[in-house]
């Protein structure tokens, strides 16, 4: 069964709409008990790292999802759901994430006087393999964010650029994270989500 994390933040309705469109069954995950029969887990999100971490901690999902990923569960974190895979986040104030990556989520500081939040279409410097199978190398994806995961590790990752490079995709085992919104990225995003559901 596919689970979609819902802690009352973000854009879950667009994910639900996509899953209904392709007739893929899913269940809402709001407590650790809901993780019991989950084979794949999507964590969409728009919001602050601090608020999400607080809600996850209060529901017990912070530890529950961390354990799910550490046990090689198939996970896709979208935007905030990716950022929470880091060890620490500095949005609003210092908070702990799942700690899947020894990384920090920090505010972007784009060159050339570019505005924040970063909103719009940018290409991802991927190699066409794995989760990016059947997606053109120069394809654009849709981003909305002011923070990014600062990653200094050997884990698989691809960058995008907005006045400087930032991490757009990261992977550790069966856990994947994307800073962009595949559910809002038209055909390329739909293919990305299908690749995750079929992998």
Task: Report residues per predicted region.
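Short glycine-/small-residue-rich Rossmann-like dinucleotide-binding loops
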Residues: 9, 45-47
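N-terminal beta1-alpha1 ligand-phosphate binding loop
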Residues: 2-23, 182-185
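Short, Asp-centered acidic motifs that coordinate Mg2+ and/or phosphate
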Residues: 40
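C-terminal and late-domain segments of enzyme folds
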Residues: 148-199
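Short amphipathic alpha-helical segments
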Residues: 16-17, 53-56, 87-90, 155-156, ...
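Short acidic low-complexity segments
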Residues: 26-37
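Cysteine-nucleophile active-site neighborhood
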Residues: 49-118
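Pocket-forming structural segment of enzyme catalytic cores
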Residues: 88-164
